Amino acid sequence: MLYFDRFKAVMIAVLSLLCAGSVYEDISSGFFLFQKLRVGRIERYVISKIAANMFLVTTATIGGILLFVAFVRPLMPLVGNNPQQDIVEYYDIYQTLGPILYLAAMGLIFGLSASFFTSFGLWIVFYMPDRFAAHAISFLVYYGLLSITDFLPKELDVWNLTSAAKMLRMTDSSFWNYLYSVSLLLVLNAISGIVLWKKLKGRYENG
């Protein structure tokens, strides 16, 4: 599990730099309006930005985790002499794929989680063209949903989701739990894109 709770919000705020900044530049330079007129459909622009945000944030997350592992590898063993199965989520995936691919698989979950939260930064720059606002809103939404979902069933708990924990109470199967987490995050990112598209379509078509 990814127990770096004190740093998750900071990581999300930093990762929001990857795509929200380019949207801010589009708006401040007038490029967004040019793009809208050129492609004829605002959804193409939104899809490209949501897809780019997901790809950049996820790959940066996985790359960052693996880079950190490479950095500390000379200082400590990659795997302890006596790994404890009971504190390692998806232990069978770890046994099957090995430590590096296991970390990449867990990083994928946090990366998709982070891309969902950073997508709120894409929203805010259209209404408040400010770089700081884009980073702050991702940070605040993460903490807000973390607090709200603490009272919801395990399957909807943001803490479990961003920690790459197994979320399904009905089964301990790593396959179904991993599939559920990734599918839920893909759906959340898609919903974020759809809402952004509808908001912008209404705003710019109505002048």
Predicted regions mapped to residue ranges:
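Junction motif at the cytosolic side of a transmembrane helix
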Residues: 127, 184-207
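Secretory targeting signals
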Residues: 1-22, 47-122, 126, 164-183
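Transmembrane helix boundary and interhelical loop/hinge segments in multi-pass membrane proteins
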Residues: 19-36
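Central hydrophobic cores of alpha-helical transmembrane segments
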Residues: 131-145
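Residue-level recognition of pore/gate-forming positions within transmembrane alpha-helices
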Residues: 53, 139-143, 189
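Short helix-to-coil transition segments within interhelical loops
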Residues: 36-42
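Juxtamembrane non-transmembrane "cap" segments at the membrane-aqueous interface
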Residues: 74-87, 141-160
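Helix-loop interface residues and adjacent transmembrane-helix termini in multi-pass membrane transporters
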Residues: 39, 127-128
